[in-house]
Structures are given as structure tokens and as C-alpha cells.
Swiss-Prot record, chain A:
This is Trafficking protein particle complex subunit 2-like protein. It comes from Taeniopygia guttata. Pfam families: Sedlin_N. The lineage of its organism: Eukaryota, Metazoa, Chordata, Craniata, Vertebrata. Gene3D superfamilies: 3.30.450.70. The keyword Transport applies. GO terms for cellular component: endoplasmic reticulum; Golgi apparatus; perinuclear region of cytoplasm.
């Protein structure tokens, strides 16, 4: 279960940020922002190799003492960043990958909504529902 | 690990048959997502142009009418259906043949009025509204109003004046999409002056 | 065996299209009059056939023939009427008429957004394709001198 999920546009501004409400949201925003540097570094490293199978999932970006941050970039340079609680060791790599895949599918569904202009903030009910299902259930 | 576009299994293919104009005429397939996206682009452009939901609804109806008066000829040519004897037969033909031929869905017919002149078409899924979410500032927009115009125009060409409107819409939170069709009157042949 | 001419009428009586191939003599009246006469006759024949039919009728009026020619008729539920005059050697031109309607008229005229519905057909492509189709029919031959 994620603690914070963010969708960042190609120009590195946020399209969507949602975090578990009881925590300090600003801290998450900061974490996501700093992780963008790591994402950019990984993208440029990959681009040079010109692999024919572009890996969309970036893996663990960097661990802090409480959290682990994972990244995923689409072919159109839209980035998904997920912050996960470090204490939750049950989460394996495959699960993280599948969560990103679901995010990517929901994101493409939003793009197909004719009322959505690419570059706008995301206000979709369906996307919210999907993200909520992935966030930690905090009572 | 390569990543599949997971929606591939869900995209429906619509089959549009080219008639035999030439012996090499072939089956043409079109992806329904392209159709949905095209319709969506049309509606959003109309919203930008007119800025007022009512005007957009009227335009969609007009466009649908123009499509309907032509579509009926294509339908009659392809399906070889003869004249319908009553409104019930018309309803059956619309739901089972016409909708199937053009949109690939078969709505169900319910809610006949006691006089037999009104009925409802229930569409479980409407291919025009895949992926669409209506924003809050367009709450009075009837997104699929084109369908109403098409039905009205097509039936007018076979001498039936009908009134068609949406009563339920999945985009507005209802569970199904329901179109209500009401028979108004039969349009009689009017002969040119001097005949009989 | 030959084909004389083709008319296409719409429900209100207007002639949308006329084309002839082997017509030996004209009617002697202006073309407008000829169209009105043809439409009026068809209308009367249709209602006559419907009234006089001994059982329930599906297609109604389909064709008539005289000692010199046969007239074939196709009417769609949308009110479009196609009339083909051939000589007596042609037993039925129903499929030809259906092909002209479904594959030529609908495809080239109805689906053309620049052709307003129920207006006379100006489309050159339609005329060409129709001509090619009619000439390709097995019963289109040079005019039989006796007819």
C-alpha cells in the first residue's frame, strides 16, 4: 500500500498528488520533488544506451529512513512516483510493478476522455477511486 | 519485462463491409476506439464553439438528423428489410438490426406505453461514451444527442414522425442509458399539384 | 435484348435522375411532362395493385410488360422509386435495380455529404459508374432492329 502517489508531467510539474491525509503532506511533496532529479538521471542514463526494449519501470529511486520511493516513466515522459512505507516489507517488486501498470492504464483512460486537456490537473473520479484503492487504509 | 497495453483485450472491432463495387472489394475493419475518440473530439469542439450546453445539444441533434436521413438508405440497401407494419416491428428492427449493424450493440426494448406508441431502448454500454467523464461545468450536456437526431432523421424518411430523447445516461450517474422513443404521427405522401 | 432507359424518382414525384441507352423514339412531349406522366402512372398502378390484390402483398407492383417493352420497378421504404425499361427478353431486372440502389446510389449519392438529400443527382461519378454497370449487364446488347 502506498503512502503517496504522484503523477508528474513531462515539464516536471505535478498533475496529481495524493497522500495519506494524516501525515505531513508537505513532506511528501518535497520527497516527490527531490526524487524527480533521480528520475531524470535514470532517464538520461537509459537514453544513451538506446535499448530496443525501453524499461518503463525505474525501480527503487532512493530509500530514506522511513520510506522508499519508486519511479515509473511512460514513453511520453510522464512520470509516476510512488512513496511506500519502509516498514511494509511485504511489498515485493512485482506488486509495485503491477501497481504502476494499473496507474498507467488509468492514466491512458483519462487521456482518452475528450474533456481532458493534456497538461491539466487530473480531476477524474475514476482515477481517484483507483488511487484510493492503492493507498494505505488509515483509519 | 515488456509491457503490454493492457486495454488491448477490451477494444472492440467494428466490421464495416464494403459492398461489391469491384470484385476486389474487401472487408474493412476499424477500431472502435478511433470512432469514440473522433466523436469525443467533435463534442468538445462544439462545446468550445458554442459555450452553451443547450446550443451544443441542438447542434448534435441537427447533425444527427443529417446523418439519419442518409443512413436510412444505406440501412435499407444493406439489410433488405421491408416496410414495418407497426411501431413494435419498427422497434425490433431498430434495436436488433440497426444498432447491431452500426454500433455493434443490441439494446433491449422495454417500458411500452399502454397505447403502444412509446417505448424505451436500454443500452448497457454505449460505445460513444467509453472513457468519457463529464466535467461539472457541463452537467446539462446530452453527450450522445447525436443518436437522437439520427433516429429521428432516419424514421422521418420512412414516414414516421417520432420524438426521441434520453431519460437516463451513464455519464450522469445512472446505471444504464435509456432512450425514450415516442411515435407522434405518420407522415403522409404529399403528391405534387396536378396529380390525382 | 437491351436496356432502354432508367428513371429515379423520389417520394414527392420529382425525378432525380434519368439516363437512356437505346431509346428509339421519344414520347413527343417535353421531358418534364414525361416524368410527371411516368410518376403519375406508377402511383396509380401501385395503389391499384394494392387494392386489387387477392392476398396480403409483400412487394406490390414489380413489373409490367407490353408487346414492345417491359418496365421493371423497385421501391424502397424510404420512398425512392427506380424504374428500368428493357425489352421483352429480360425476365426480371430486380437484382440489377437492387444493385443500382444499394451499391451505386447509396454509396455514391446518399453518402456524399455535398449532395443534398432528395435533390436531382448531379454526380458525374454516379453517371459513369451506372453507365459502366448497365453496359456490363448480360442482357445489354446492341438494339434489336425489330424492337
Amino acid at each position: 500500500m502506498a503512502v503517496c502517489i504522484a503523477v508528474i508531467a513531462k515539464e516536471n510539474y505535478p498533475l496529481y498528488i495524493r497522500s495519506v491525509p494524516t501525515e505531513n503532506e508537505l513532506k511528501f511533496h518535497y520527497t516527490v520533488h527531490t526524487s524527480l532529479d533521480v528520475v531524470d538521471e535514470k532517464i538520461s542514463a537509459m537514453g544513451k544506451a538506446l535499448v530496443d526494449q525501453r524499461e518503463l519501470y525505474l525501480g527503487l529511486l532512493y530509500p530514506t529512513e522511513d520510506y522508499k520511493v519508486y519511479g515509473y516513466v511512460t514513453n511520453s515522459k510522464v512520470k509516476f512516483v510512488m512513496v511506500v512505507d519502509s516498514s511494509n516489507t511485504a511489498l515485493r517488486d512485482n506488486e509495485i510493478r503491477s501497481m504502476f501498470r494499473k496507474l498507467h492504464n488509468s492514466y491512458t483512460d483519462i487521456m482518452c476522455n475528450p474533456f481532458y486537456n493534456p497538461g491539466d490537473r487530473i480531476h477524474s473520479r475514476a482515477f481517484d477511486t483507483m488511487v484510493n484503492s492503492m493507498m494505505m487504509q488509515v483509519c | 519485462m515488456s509491457r503490454q497495453g493492457g486495454r488491448g483485450t477490451e477494444s472492440k472491432k467494428m466490421y464495416w463491409y464494403l459492398p461489391f463495387i469491384s470484385p476486389s472489394a474487401s472487408l474493412q475493419l476499424m477500431n472502435s476506439e478511433l470512432f469514440t475518440l473522433t466523436y469525443g473530439a467533435l463534442v468538445t469542439q462544439l462545446c468550445k464553439d458554442y459555450e452553451n450546453d443547450d446550443d451544443v445539444n441542438k447542434q448534435l441533434d441537427k447533425m444527427g438528423y443529417n446523418i439519419g436521413v442518409r443512413l436510412i438508405e444505406d440501412f435499407l440497401a444493406r439489410s433488405n428489410v421491408g416496410r414495418c407494419h407497426d411501431f413494435r416491428e419498427t422497434a425490433d428492427v431498430i434495436a436488433k438490426i440497426a444498432f447491431k449493424m452500426y454500433l455493434g450493440i443490441t439494446p433491449s426494448i422495454t417500458n411500452w406505453s399502454p397505447g403502444g406508441d412509446e417505448f424505451s431502448l436500454i443500452l448497457e454500454n454505449n460505445p460513444l461514451v467509453d472513457f468519457v467523464e463529464l466535467p461539472d461545468n457541463h452537467s446539462t450536456l446530452i453527450y450522445s444527442n447525436l443518436l437522437c437526431g439520427v433516429l429521428r432523421g432516419a424514421l422521418e424518411m420512412v414516414q414516421m414522425a417520432v420524438d426521441v430523447k434520453f431519460v437516463q445516461d451513464t455519464l450522469k450517474g445512472d446505471s444504464v442509458t435509456e432512450i425514450r422513443m415516442k411515435f407522434i404521427r405518420r407522415i403522409e405522401d404529399n403528391l405534387p399539384a396536378g396529380e390525382e | 435484348m437491351t436496356i432502354h432507359n432508367l428513371y429515379i424518382f423520389e417520394r414527392g414525384g420529382r425525378c432525380l435522375f434519368y439516363s437512356e441507352w437505346h431509346r428509339r423514339r421519344g414520347p413527343g412531349i417535353p421531358q418534364e411532362e414525361e416524368f410527371k406522366l411516368m410518376f403519375g402512372m406508377l402511383f396509380s398502378l401501385r395503389s391499384f395493385v394494392a387494392k386489387m390484390s387477392p392476398t396480403d402483398m409483400r412487394d406490390g407492383f414489380v413489373a409490367f410488360h407490353t408487346s414492345k417493352y417491359r418496365l421493371h420497378y423497385l421501391e424502397t421504404p424510404s420512398g425512392l422509386r427506380l424504374v428500368l425499361n428493357t425489352d421483352l427478353g429480360v425476365p426480371s431486372a430486380r437484382e440489377a435495380l437492387q444493385h443500382i440502389y444499394g451499391n451505386l446510389f447509396v454509396e455514391l449519392v446518399v453518402k456524399n455529404p455535398l449532395c443534398p438529400p432528395r435533390a436531382p443527382v448531379q454526380s458525374l461519378l454516379f453517371r459513369q459508374r451506372l453507365d459502366a454497370f448497365v453496359r456490363s449487364l448480360p442482357y445489354f446488347g446492341p438494339r434489336n432492329p425489330q424492337n
